[in-house]
């Protein structure tokens, strides 16, 4: 029987997720600009919803690209 280790969340429990913190948000998107799923990021459901909302708001305000185009 294999033993699974519980992943630690990359965010602190009370850390505020802000749409203006682009460097933090970039850790949760792929090179193509897609939002990483919860099973990859290791976030809680509540944190994942907050990150998703922040990324989408940052995209609308042109702080993050919708699609990362390689030229």
Curated annotation (Swiss-Prot):
It is found in: Plastid, Cyanelle. GO terms for molecular function: small ribosomal subunit rRNA binding; structural constituent of ribosome. GO terms for cellular component: cyanelle; cytosolic small ribosomal subunit. Keywords: Cyanelle, Plastid, Ribonucleoprotein, Ribosomal protein, RNA-binding, rRNA-binding. InterPro entries: Ribosomal_bS18, Ribosomal_bS18_CS, Ribosomal_bS18_sf. One of its GO terms (biological process) is translation. Belongs to the bacterial ribosomal protein bS18 family. Part of the 30S ribosomal subunit. This is Small ribosomal subunit protein bS18c. It comes from Cyanophora paradoxa.
């Amino acid at each position: 029987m294999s033993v699974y280790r519980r992943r630690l969340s990359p965010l602190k429990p009370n850390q505020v997720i802000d749409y203006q913190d682009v460097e933090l948000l970039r850790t949760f998107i792929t090179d193509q600009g897609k939002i990483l799923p919860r099973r990859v990021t290791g976030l809680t459901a509540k944190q994942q919803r907050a990150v998703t909302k922040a990324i989408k708001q940052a995209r609308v305000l042109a702080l993050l690209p919708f699609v990362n185009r390689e030229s």
